[in-house]
């Protein structure tokens, strides 16, 4: 006969695995996994599930342990960080985390921002990091096509926001990605 244990199966928290000190002057820090959006072209929610933000203290502990000069915060939807943790510091806003990381690291960079969630407060926090770098997932500028993609915003709104950022910080750098030939 086969003995089956009744002990609970341990869970593996892949977002909070300990990491060694960075051997590079930069380090990527994953602050959340998954996504709550249902863009028409994206499969991330189907295989990574809903957004799960890491606890701010575990992120700050990792940043300190890595001892990197530049910290690159990464998630599928950075601006939604914390919305799934409503009782924590700065609930529903990534701004307190950006400010806390910036107080520790010489430079802080954010990858993958949804342009419709780019608040004035977040723009100011990014400009204060030492790296005024805006990685905006624009995808397209046509409002009707963006609606078919199940995304919000439009080219005019995006350009106004970029112009506003340029007025605040003339040295700001931008990166984006665009989908051409969207079949939807």
Predicted segments with their positions:
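Proteins enriched for Cys/Gly/acidic motifs involved in redox and nucleic-acid/cofactor modification
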Residues: 1-82, 124, 130, 155-167
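Conserved SAM/AdoMet-binding glycine-rich loop
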Residues: 68-183
């Amino acid at each position: 006969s086969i003995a089956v244990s009744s002990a609970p199966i341990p869970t593996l928290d892949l977002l909070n695995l300990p990491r060694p000190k960075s051997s590079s002057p930069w380090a990527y820090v994953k602050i959340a996994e998954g996504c709550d959006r249902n863009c028409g072209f994206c499969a991330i929610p189907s295989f990574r599930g809903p957004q799960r933000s890491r606890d701010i203290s575990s992120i700050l502990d990792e940043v300190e342990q890595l001892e990197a000069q530049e910290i690159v915060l990464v998630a599928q939807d950075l601006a939604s960080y914390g919305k799934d943790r409503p009782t924590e510091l700065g609930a529903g806003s990534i701004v307190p985390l950006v400010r806390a990381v910036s107080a520790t690291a010489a430079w802080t960079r954010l990858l993958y921002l949804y342009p419709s969630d780019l608040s004035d407060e977040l723009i100011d926090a990014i400009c204060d990091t030492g790296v005024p770098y805006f990685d905006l997932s624009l995808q397209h500028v046509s409002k009707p096509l963006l609606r078919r993609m199940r995304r919000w915003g439009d080219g005019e709104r995006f350009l106004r926001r970029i112009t506003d950022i340029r007025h605040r910080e003339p040295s700001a750098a931008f990166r984006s990605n665009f989908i051409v030939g969207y079949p939807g």
